[in-house]
Amino acid sequence: METELPKRKANRLPTYDYAQSGAYFITICTRERQQILWADNDLKPAANTDKNVGASIARPQVVAPLSKPGKIVEQCILQIPSHYQGVLVEKYAVMPNHVHLLLLLQSWQDGRAMLAPTATISQIVQQFKGAVTKNLGHSIWQKSFHDHVIRTRYGFEMIWQYIDINPQNWHKDCFYKEPPP
């Protein structure tokens, strides 16, 4: 007697074209949420690293030294636009056990329609994960990724700010896991 395995829930919107122009918030987690991307996972805001955020308001910044895998992840993030015409990495954060990306896909460049279609978000993430794996010699990623299609300017600004302050709120993050003693 064969037992039927449970079917995985589809992570993407079934009728949405993930190659169309737009803004996308992507989160990619490490396997078993291993905290391997920062050199020190218990960081606090550093002295004299306040960032002026306007209206005479300063926000303390966390300066997170990246581990070797974290540095490779950052290099691969910065290379994404060179692999895909019309794809911009607007903002990113390398966290101890996950990565946030704010990607812009544009079908227009310099006021002209681009000849080649833009890759889908899934293809971009697959290439990124593959590049990190190739550079490290082994995979550090969990299967799949989380995505959110950003539909409004307000949503874009909120996610941009979330990514910007995420390192200093690491201990409050939903992906935070208490490190073993």
Predicted regions and their residues:
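Short catalytic/metal-binding and nucleic-acid-binding patches
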Residues: 1-181
